[in-house]
UniProtKB/Swiss-Prot annotation:
The keyword Hydrolase applies. GO terms for molecular function: epoxide hydrolase activity. It comes from the Bacteria. It comes from Pseudomonas sp. (strain AD1). This enzyme acts on aliphatic epoxides. Its substrates include epichlorohydrin, epibromohydrin, epoxyoctane and styrene epoxide. Monomer. This is Epoxide hydrolase. GO terms for biological process: catabolic process. Its EC number is 3.3.2.10. Keywords: Aromatic hydrocarbons catabolism, Hydrolase. It catalyses: an epoxide + H2O = an ethanediol.
Length: 77
């Protein structure tokens, strides 16, 4: 999970081969910028192809890139 200050303006997250940036101006909406989006999309597609992966890998991304995400839940495991 990510612990970011509530008033952050720029925050980076490094996933394998992909860097994700959160950018926010004041109280405005948060922008999500992904370097190498083709790699990020490939990671998601690969997660869908894993046997018995009923959630498609999105729990990993939800828990790891949202700055306001809750901690891991039983569903995430």
């Amino acid at each position: 999970t990510i612990d970011x200050p509530e008033d952050f303006k720029h925050y980076e997250v490094q996933l394998p081969d992909v860097k994700i940036h959160y950018v926010r101006e004041g109280a405005g909406p948060t922008l999500l910028l992904v370097e190498k989006p083709e790699i990020a999309i490939d990671r998601i597609k690969t997660a869908f192809r894993k046997p018995d992966n009923i959630h498609g890998g999105f729990n990993y991304y939800r828990a790891n890139i949202r700055p306001d995400a809750a901690l891991w839940t039983d569903l995430d495991h």
